[in-house]
């Protein structure tokens, strides 16, 4: 008889940079790349339909940030755009884990986001850093498999009160590293990732991350990490990269449990496998995906590998660990 295929330990949907707005198509800041604001919701609906039809059913969805576009704030449509996106995701009977991106923070302050459906950090607070407005947390996906959600804008001028110490510290970083009049411009920078549309990690979050990975090491767990901004330069274009990415990598490399780091932000997508055997997968963004294509996938985790089945612009991958 044929051997029955081994069932995955866990399966989860992945999607990034939906950036929905009820607006005509536009372009990126460079003016060269088309953005399909209104179509992105239709592509999300297709993704949800596909995930809902999977058998065995998926366990959860990882939404990697920038669910709605920044222009919603100017149009007074932040709330309604978010409700439409969450309404579609809410049709799935499984949890959705959200990373906060720069576009969430163009639309809402951190305090406001904490009262929306994008706040997926578990109630009670013991699962994340001491700062309740830091959207980082961990949870078990299955026996021996943990998810860690990182907040890549913990250190940022976005979504923070200008009087707050966090804002002031982030402003100091930008002033020191970016002499351009426009902090969103990487022009001429030796370190082009020091721009305002990226962010970084507070020491408190890094210390917390280290403790979680220590726990997973001790309990022989494997860990999947997710956050909006890439943290490995080779899973990036050199610009879309967390400010203090080296600090995050050094936490990961001082443990053996992390198998994969998922990110968005870079709409072209990227991938690398580092010298420690960690996979860094940056997903192609829905927002720059033509209406006849798509950009989502499902990752199936087995004992010794993860298999990504991608749709549209996202290629299939086998990632061994």
Can you name each region flagged by the protein language model?
Residues 225-231, 259-269:
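Histidine-centered catalytic micro-motifs
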Residues 216-234:
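Short acidic, glycine-rich surface-loop motifs adjacent to enzyme active sites
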Residues 12, 61, 147, 223-224:
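Hydrophobic beta-strand anchors of alpha/beta hydrolase catalytic cores
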Residues 1-6, 30-34, 72-219, 244-257, ...:
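Extended active-site neighborhood of metal-dependent phosphoesterases/phosphodiesterases
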Residues 1-79:
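N-terminal active-site segment of His-dependent metallophosphoesterases
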Residues 17, 65-66, 101-102, 150, ...:
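Active-site glycine-centered loops adjacent to acidic/histidine catalytic or metal-binding residues
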Residues 22, 70-72, 232-235, 241, ...:
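Short, solvent-exposed loop/turn segments at secondary-structure junctions
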């Amino acid at each position: 008889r044929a051997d029955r295929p081994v069932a995955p330990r866990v399966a989860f949907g992945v999607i990034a940079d939906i950036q929905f707005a009820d607006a005509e198509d536009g372009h990126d800041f460079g003016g060269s790349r088309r953005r399909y604001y209104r179509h992105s919701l239709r592509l999300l609906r297709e993704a949800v339909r596909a995930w809902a039809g999977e058998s065995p059913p998926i366990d959860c969805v990882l939404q990697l940030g920038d669910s709605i576009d920044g222009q919603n704030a100017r149009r007074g449509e932040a709330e309604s755009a978010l409700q439409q996106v969450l309404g579609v995701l809410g049709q799935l009977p499984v949890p959705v884990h959200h990373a906060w991106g720069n576009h969430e923070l163009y639309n809402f302050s951190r305090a406001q986001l904490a009262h929306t459906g994008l706040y997926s950090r578990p109630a009670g607070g013991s699962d994340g850093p001491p700062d309740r407005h830091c959207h980082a947390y961990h949870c078990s996906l299955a026996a021996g498999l943990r998810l860690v959600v990182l907040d890549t804008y913990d250190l940022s001028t976005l979504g923070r009160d200008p009087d707050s110490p966090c804002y002031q510290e982030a402003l100091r970083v930008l002033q020191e590293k970016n002499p351009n009049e426009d902090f969103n411009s990487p022009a001429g920078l030796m370190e082009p990732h020091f721009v305002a549309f990226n962010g970084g990690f507070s020491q408190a979050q890094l210390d917390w991350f280290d403790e979680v990975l220590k726990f997973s090491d001790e309990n022989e767990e494997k860990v999947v990490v997710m956050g909006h901004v890439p943290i490995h330069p080779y899973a990036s274009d050199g610009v879309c990269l967390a400010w203090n990415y080296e600090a995050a990598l050094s936490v990961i490399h001082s443990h053996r449990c992390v198998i994969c780091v998922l990110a968005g932000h870079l709409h072209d997508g990227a991938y690398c496998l580092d010298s420690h055997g960690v996979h860094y997968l940056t997903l192609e963004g829905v927002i720059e995906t033509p209406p006849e294509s798509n950009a989502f996938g499902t990752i199936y985790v087995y004992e010794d590998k993860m298999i990504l089945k991608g749709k549209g612009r996202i290629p299939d991958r086998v990632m061994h660990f």
